[in-house]
Every structure is written in C-alpha cells, then in structure tokens.
C-alpha cells in the first residue's frame, strides 16, 4: 500500500479542478489517500472587488481541468448579496461524513459539487445537514456529530499546517507520494483534464 498525502481545502477552486484526479487515485487499491485539510478561509464575506478575480480564476480552472462551474454558483459570485465562504464548516462536514461511513473522496466531491455547481450556502449548517441527508445519512446523528466537530477540525487543520511546513508545501492542491521512506511530489497539474494519462502515470508507481 502506497500513501499519498493530499493537501487540500474544500473551498479551493483548483482542488475542485483536481477532483477527477482524486477520484482516479481513490479507485486504485494500491494507493491510500491521507487527507490534510488546510482551513484556507475562515468564515467571511468575500469583498466585491475580489469576486471578479474569482471568476477569472474559475475560467482558467475550467479551461485547464474541464471542471464545470454551475450557473447557480456563478450567480452567487456575481450577485448583490453577500458571498460567504467558509472552509471550516465544510471541513467539519468532510470529517463528519467520513465518521458516518461516507468515503472521503465521495464526501469531498459532494461538498465541492454543492458549492461549485449548485451554488449552495455551505456556510449554513442546515444546508450541510440537508446535503448529508441527501447522501443517506441520519439528520439527528449528523447534527449531533457536527456540534462536536469543531475541536477535531481545528486539530486536523493545525496538523496539516505543521506538516506543510515540514514538507515545504505552500499551496493547494498538493499530492505527495510516500514510498520506501521517500517523499515525492506528484506533478498533478500536468494531468488536469487528462484522467487516463493520470491513471497510467500512477500505475508506474505500483
């Protein structure tokens, strides 16, 4: 079994662009993904002047990765209402989803779709609860676990930051392969939008 350390954030656009690469990696039984959430954006309203930059970056991501950004999401970014982004609540949901039996890559992809395609307000805990229910999870259990998830989330984010410092990781997404006591950064950006080539590349390590 080969470990791949994945440094990411649920609200990172390039991580959304890399979601198909994560899916390929998760489907190869010889690899185990170790997820390191980064807590990129504490809950905050994005300044209107920065929204145009987001749209430009999204266009670049879509062009390079073939990821789809939905109309509902774009309407939120360009709208007159506050556009609130929260890495912490979505990371809590990511962790609780796994605790309740959802595979990590499936939970992450569902959160990313809800944000980047469906334009849902994932800073609101009731919206995250509805997402959990749509994935077959019990709402009462979900709410109970979410209420207790803050400390674990902050601990995981701090561990991620510590490891990022040790490994000189400066951004998301980053994939680092651990093999025979060696750590190697995988050139994932060479394979954006090229899942078959990515699969063939990964097979060389097995």
Model-predicted segments: where are they?
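Short metal-coordination and nucleic-acid-contact micro-motifs, chiefly zinc-binding Cys/His arrays
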Residues: 8
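C-terminal cap of thioredoxin/glutaredoxin-like
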Residues: 11, 19-25, 113-206
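Extreme N-terminal starter segment of soluble prokaryotic enzymes
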Residues: 1-5
């Amino acid at each position: 079994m080969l470990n791949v350390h994945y440094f990411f954030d649920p609200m990172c656009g390039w991580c959304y662009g890399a979601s198909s690469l994560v899916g390929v990696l998760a489907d190869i039984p010889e690899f185990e993904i170790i997820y390191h959430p980064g807590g990129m954006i504490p809950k905050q309203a994005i300044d209107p002047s920065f929204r145009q930059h987001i749209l430009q970056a999204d266009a670049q991501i879509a062009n390079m990765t073939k990821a789809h950004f939905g109309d509902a999401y774009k309407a939120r970014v360009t709208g007159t209402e506050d556009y609130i982004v929260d890495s912490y609540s979505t990371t809590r949901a990511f962790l609780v989803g796994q605790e309740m039996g959802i595979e990590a890559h499936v939970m992450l992809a569902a959160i990313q779709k809800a944000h980047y395609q469906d334009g849902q307000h994932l800073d609101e805990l009731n919206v995250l609860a509805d997402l959990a229910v749509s994935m077959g999870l019990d709402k009462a259990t979900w709410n109970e676990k979410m209420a207790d998830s803050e400390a674990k989330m902050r601990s995981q984010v701090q561990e991620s930051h510590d490891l990022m410092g040790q490994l000189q990781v400066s951004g998301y997404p980053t994939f680092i392969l651990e093999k025979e006591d060696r750590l190697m950064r995988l050139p994932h950006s060479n394979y954006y939008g090229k899942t078959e080539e990515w699969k063939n590349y990964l097979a060389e390590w097995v």
